[in-house]
Amino acid sequence: MSPQLPYPELLQPLSPGNTVNAGIRLYRAHFKEYSGIAVTTVVWIAGLLILAVPIAFIFYAVLPPAIATLLILPLGFVLSFYCFGRYLAGSAAISRLVFKELLGEFETAKDAKRFTNARAWGFWVIGLILFALFSALIIGVYLALAIVLALIFSSLGGFAALQNNPFGVLEGLVRSPATAIALFLGILAIVVVFTIAWTWVAARFAITELPYGIEPETKPADSVGRSWTLTEKNAWHTVMVLFVSSLIMVPVSVVLQIVSSILQVILVGLSGSDNSAVLAVVYLASFALGMLGIVITLPIAQSIKGVLYFDLCNRREGLKLQLPRDEPRDKVPTDTTPVRSTLELFKKVTLLTPESVELEFILAGIGNRALALLIDNLLVLLGISFFWFFGTLFATQLVTVLSPDRYAVAILWFVAIAFLGTFLISSGYFVLFETLRQGQTPGKRFAQIRVIRDDGRPVGLTQAVLRALLRPIDDTFFIVGAVLILFDKNEKRLGDLVAGTLVIQEERMSTKRSIALSDSAQSLARQLPTLSDITQLQPDDFAVVREFLQRRDFLTAKARTDLSMNLARQTRTLVHLETIPAGVTSDQFLEAIYLAYQSGGT
């Protein structure tokens, strides 16, 4: 029998938002377990930082300074490596637990920590490899950029101008605004291209520690290469997942920073800024809050990375592309049932329409909503920037024709119009799209989610306006809305609660993706009903075959070959076919099975 799937919904690749949703869902389900690992992990770092000062004080108090320094440096180096190694190992243990659960190979926290702790030094090797790679990359890019700019500057006569008149270049730019603008745009383009390229490269190495922390046969150097392989064709998917997960953890950082600031103001205000004892308490409190922040955010981040690693393996290697059984129905024991987890990775809601029809939807979740909000806010910011830019140009021209005694009144009008326009753009954007596009803004469309009423009907103008008016409260540091979405049973923010709306996921229909079918497969499909028993295939079996055919071009070459041969062997056994006809590849056989099943096996 093939391994059963504890989460059948993971057969298809996850969207960036759902990757985050699944990670948070698993974190909440295993809060005690993952947080316990985070606490023990942070203790290694906190202990190192706390004990460093008294240890150094004792050494310098007992020994001569030169000898103390010679002893402290190697000792501190070894302790730092060991403690940070345990920190990295503990972080990887959380991702390992997530990956194992999604794979159906459940493991205890004790076993996961034992595995990663035994490899603690290897995580440092991975870090050193990355440091060397990125250092070489930075130096190479810097030198190449310097050479290119020097050649351009020289070809334009810049060096000669500097020798004759050091300020001549600046004077030339002042006399020629077009040249200055072109230079500015060129520099801006270089910065944008460099940022995009750097982000892409960073994404390719974003999961370097996970193969080493999860796969027993993987060495540190191999782990770096495996990250590069798995993120091929998925770099921007990885960027979106990591960016959204960072956005979700902003509220935690903001709240802790607010608490730290309030505590500092209170203590300093009561005792004065010159009181060294109070300052020590403030620093210790800030340190404790910082460690608390790591305890909260570390398991969230590592849970999401564990889901991301699983999803990348599924995308590139087809982890879930296995038939749930290897034998025909008449040979499978009657007491064998698919193993499903009792945990729902994606929360569902059942609505009753005015026509008394029950509809089931998957809620959008905080991951998809954060991704949509990010895109929408970028578009709103772009619109506001254009409004202020052209508004400023218009105001500047208008002021030149006004008399000086009207300047004060004009400025007040300009400010009022600016704020009114900003409000209309920021609120009207959401009202307009949600009303006219059936609850979808461009961001929601990208994230494949939409807003509906509590009874399943499309949102109207009233609901869209209420949601838009309350959005500033929900979006303040992403705190209010995020907290409500996480803890409300229907994942509603304040605007949803008042407007009576829900944010749901659109159904992702995998059948819409085209499948290239060969002539040989179509010919074999017509023969299969007489050569085999296609009725032995179950819908779940067909779904796996279809998923492979749709995704085979995105798999690695080795994974595609292995999966194709394995699925062909399993399917051949299921349909009682003795051998695959000569000259037919495993891919062509699966294509024929796909066609024959769709035709009803006749």
Regions found by a protein language model. Name each.
Residues W228-T238:
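Membrane-water interface at loop-to-transmembrane-helix junctions
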Residues F487-Q522:
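Canonical alpha-helical transmembrane segment with a positive-inside/aromatic-interface signature
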Residues T108, F205, E217-G225, G318, ...:
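Juxtamembrane/interfacial segments flanking transmembrane helices
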Residues S2-G104, R114, G122, I126-L173, ...:
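Short, small/hydrophobic-residue-rich motifs at membrane-helix boundaries and re-entrant hairpins
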Residues Y309-T336, A499-I504:
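Short, highly charged, low-complexity non-transmembrane loops/tails of multi-pass membrane proteins
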Residues L466-G500:
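Ligand/cofactor pocket segment of small-molecule handling proteins
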Residues I126, T231, N314:
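Polar-ligand-bearing catalytic/cofactor-coordination segments
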